[in-house]
Amino acid sequence: MNIILLGPPGAGKGTQAKKIAMRYGIPHISTGDMLREAVAAGTELGKKVKEIIEKGLLVPDDLMVAIVEDRLKKPDSAKGFILDGFPRTVQQAESLSGILGNLGKELDAVILIDAPEEVVVERISSRRVCPSCGKVYNLLTIKPKNDMLCDDCNIGLIQREDDKPATVRERYRVYMEKTAPVINYYSEHGSLITIDGSLDIEAVTEEIFKNLENL
């Protein structure tokens, strides 16, 4: 099954992608994770990505398309995939269509997990990360056992620059400006499924599986 997950940052795409991946035995391909790995590696590409992310801007289309194309060519994507965080522009959506055509694949579903700005800001600004092992916590839902310390490393947790409220609001603004047209693009192609992302995690999962089983 070939699936795209759309929605604003903080809507819960990553959480739901992992559940779908486990159920259908397909890889969860998160462009966000791939970009953060580049930043952590400290390469020239990573430095460029870091600067873009910290400003709350979108990574250029040509860079994202190249990253995704390479990933979809890997053997574990042969039976399907879940794309989380891509496409974010209509140009990326059109490029993806070309990539899939070349690989002999078609999209089965485009799932939009929608959530309002205030929900997004509250969720993301509550995230904390261990600078050593990279484990992610949330002060609302996945709290550390000891106040502001990693359960595994006992090191003080930090707030990533792109998780701070001002940056989150800018990311949401950019999302609405750039990604909303992608929703219209897939809506016109008849493959869009909209889910209320302000619901709790279990309710969102139930709605997603209900829709996928009816395809």
From Swiss-Prot:
One annotated Gene Ontology cellular component of this protein: cytoplasm
EC number(s) on file: 2.7.4.3
Keyword entries, A-Z: ATP-binding, Cytoplasm, Kinase, Metal-binding, Nucleotide biosynthesis, Nucleotide-binding, Transferase, Zinc
Principal localisation: cytoplasm
One GO MF term attached to the UniProt entry: adenylate kinase activity
Protein residues bound to ATP: 10-15, 127, 136-137, 199
Coiled coil: none
CDD domains listed in its UniProt record: ADK
Family membership noted in the UniProt record: Belongs to the adenylate kinase family.
Domain notes: Consists of three domains, a large central CORE domain and two small peripheral domains, NMPbind and LID, which undergo movements during catalysis. The LID domain closes over the site of phosphoryl transfer upon ATP binding. Assembling and dissambling the active center during each catalytic cycle provides an effective means to prevent ATP hydrolysis. Some bacteria have evolved a zinc-coordinating structure that stabilizes the LID domain.
Name of the molecule in the record: Adenylate kinase
Organism: Kosmotoga olearia (strain ATCC BAA-1733 / DSM 21960 / TBF 19.5.1)
Lineage: Bacteria, Thermotogati, Thermotogota, Thermotogae, Kosmotogales
